[in-house]
């Protein structure tokens, strides 16, 4: 699908409804932010980047969890969050076009009653560049998501207090050569210091 923004631009995205839906029942939604390898214009890269969503499907988790899945695709040369991955920290920048349009398209999807989305069970996860996207999404909407799984990302530590209530399961490989593992550790430490 293609989302045409009422503000400016368009975004390619994929969504999948729960495998089994019953009228009147609400279902969880997983918003997925792909890594740099998923960028492009084919509306497929976000599904196969680093095994992300394709692994989710192969393991049977979509059927088991019976949830909606929503995944936008960042065009080549752009990012979910406009910051350098080599930095040891950053302040939340102006929202990127891809993040803005993903939020617009996601909101439209959620608000459509035929999709039967449970607004108390909206989860977000992403890897690498998408880990940054996950942190950015929860910084911008700390009360919107039920939980977050940022994998190999980094965020703005000054937002830690507003994230202290949110269940976060952060992952980062110690040998990551692209994004320093300290980016994830520093975020979790800041959230713990803020009471999380």
Where are these regions (language model features)?
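A domain-start/cap signature at the N-terminus of enzymes
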Residues: 1-29, 67, 101, 125-127, ...
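Gly/Ser-rich "nucleophile elbow"/oxyanion-hole loop immediately N-terminal to the catalytic nucleophile
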Residues: 21-25, 79-128
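Active-site machinery of serine-nucleophile hydrolases
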Residues: 29, 36-100
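Alpha/beta-hydrolase
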Residues: 31-33, 151
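The conserved beta1-alpha1 loop
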Residues: 33-35, 172
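Short alpha-helix in the alpha/beta-hydrolase fold that links the catalytic acid
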Residues: 44-46, 180-190
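Primarily recognizes the serine-hydrolase "nucleophile elbow" in alpha/beta-hydrolase
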Residues: 111-164
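Short beta-strand/loop motif that positions the catalytic acidic residue
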Residues: 169-172, 176
């Amino acid at each position: 699908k293609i989302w045409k923004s009422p503000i400016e631009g368009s975004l390619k995205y994929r969504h999948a409804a729960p495998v089994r839906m019953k009228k009147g029942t609400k279902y969880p939604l997983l918003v997925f932010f792909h890594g740099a390898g998923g960028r492009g214009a084919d509306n497929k890269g976000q599904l196969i980047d680093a095994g992300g969503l394709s692994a989710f499907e192969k393991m049977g988790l979509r059927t088991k969890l019976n949830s909606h899945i929503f995944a936008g695709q960042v065009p080549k040369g752009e990012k979910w969050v406009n910051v350098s991955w080599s930095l040891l920290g950053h302040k939340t920048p102006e929202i990127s076009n891809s993040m803005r349009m993903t939020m617009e398209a996601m909101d439209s999807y959620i608000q459509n009653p035929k999709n039967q989305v449970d607004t108390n069970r909206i989860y977000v996860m992403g890897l690498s560049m998408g880990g940054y996207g996950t942190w950015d999404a929860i910084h911008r909407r700390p009360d919107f998501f039920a939980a977050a799984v940022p994998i190999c990302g980094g965020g703005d530590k000054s937002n830690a207090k507003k994230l202290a209530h949110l269940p976060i399961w952060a992952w980062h490989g110690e040998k990551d050569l692209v994004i320093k593992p300290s980016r994830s550790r520093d975020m979790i430490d800041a959230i713990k210091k803020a009471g999380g």
